[in-house]
Swiss-Prot record:
This is L-lactate dehydrogenase. It comes from Mycoplasma pneumoniae (strain ATCC 29342 / M129 / Subtype 1). Keywords: Cytoplasm, NAD, Oxidoreductase, Phosphoprotein. It holds the Pfam family Ldh_1_N. The active site is at H177. The lineage of its organism: Bacteria, Bacillati, Mycoplasmatota, Mycoplasmoidales, Mycoplasmoidaceae.
Length: 312
């Protein structure tokens, strides 16, 4: 079996949470950290090296640069400024972070890298689209974390509401990873059964609205309380990396380039995708209610309007 190499660009809280989770899963034989801040880069490498003896697989953790990426299989990008406390939206990060992403994309392209890239920098759908356009890489090999974490929050909220395990919940959030995202309640299920089977509420729509409100406010509440979110996205993206590198063909909600699905083209947003060694191997278009479709159309338009601001 080929030894795998995973690189991290941006050694902030999100990036290092991803790498630590990846190491805990024994994903690779070598991990490389790239960061413009050498002090932080080396400090995080030292800290992660100390975790190697307790990890399930022996691995090397090194500080490196873009020139070394040619030999790597997988890149995770977490670089960029995070949201500020006080209710800053992800889209408000666009102006500064898009220039950072353009520079990263150029450097990765020049390195000769041929593997798969997973991006979590916000606003993630536009950052992933920017990276795709600047690099010119195959669309299936450029993936945004999209509404992966939103969907995990939805599953958690449903499980908590009905006293079930989140592993038995099948539910998705589509569209922008942001305020215009759409919770797909119409097809949500627990152990194959619709949610109404478990609800005792007289007004089930109100109950669903409360769940939706919870997941929309979750990130803002975490940021207000501790300054940033990173454990949830770190674990979720490490799982995506594992599904890809182990070629499992499992479905997760990530952002991929849309080409006709949901009536949209040339935009990236969260939707269920089959993941394997080629990255996104299939984009799944799930059935939506009229209200959900209208919400997704609005979310797509929000993304398209903001893509123009990226000046690609």
């Amino acid at each position: 079996m080929k030894s795998l190499k995973v690189a991290l660009i941006g050694s902030g809280a999100v990036g290092t949470s991803f790498l630590y989770a990846a190491m805990s899963r024994g994903l690779a034989s070598e991990y490389m950290v790239i960061d413009i801040n050498e002090k932080s880069q080396v400090g995080n490498v030292f800290d992660l090296q100390d975790a190697v003896p307790s990890s399930p697989q022996y691995s090397k953790v090194i500080a490196g640069d873009y020139k070394q990426l040619k030999d790597y299989d997988f890149i995770f990008i977490g670089a960029g400024r995070p949201q500020k406390q006080g209710g800053e939206t992800r889209l408000q990060l666009l102006e500064g972070n898009v220039e950072i992403m353009k520079n990263i994309a150029k450097a990765v392209k020049e390195s000769g890298f041929k593997g798969i890239t997973l991006i979590a920098s916000n606003p993630v759908d536009i950052m992933a689209y920017t990276y795709l356009k600047v690099t010119g890489f195959e669309p299936n090999k450029v993936i945004g974390s999209g509404t992966l974490l939103d969907s995990a929050r939805l599953k958690f909220a449903i499980a908590e509401k009905y006293g079930m395990s989140s592993r038995d919940v099948q539910a998705y959030v589509l569209g922008e990873h942001g305020d215009s995202s759409v919770s797909i309640i119409s097809s949500a299920k627990i152990a194959g059964l619709p949610l109404k089977h478990f609800s005792k509420a007289s007004d089930i729509e109100k109950e669903f609205a409360e769940i939706d409100h919870f997941i929309r406010r979750r990130a803002y509440e975490i940021i207000e309380r501790k300054g940033a979110t990173f454990y949830g996205i770190g674990e979720a993206t490490a799982e995506v990396a594992e599904l890809i590198l182990r070629d499992t063909k499992e479905v997760r909600v990530v952002a991929s380039l849309i080409n006709g699905q949901y009536g949209a083209k040339d935009v990236m947003f969260g939707t269920p995708c089959v993941l394997g060694r080629n990255g996104v191997e299939k984009i799944l278009e799930i059935e939506l209610s009229a209200t959900e479709k209208a919400g997704l159309d609005k979310s797509i338009q929000v993304l398209k309007d903001n893509i123009k601001l990226a000046k690609l």
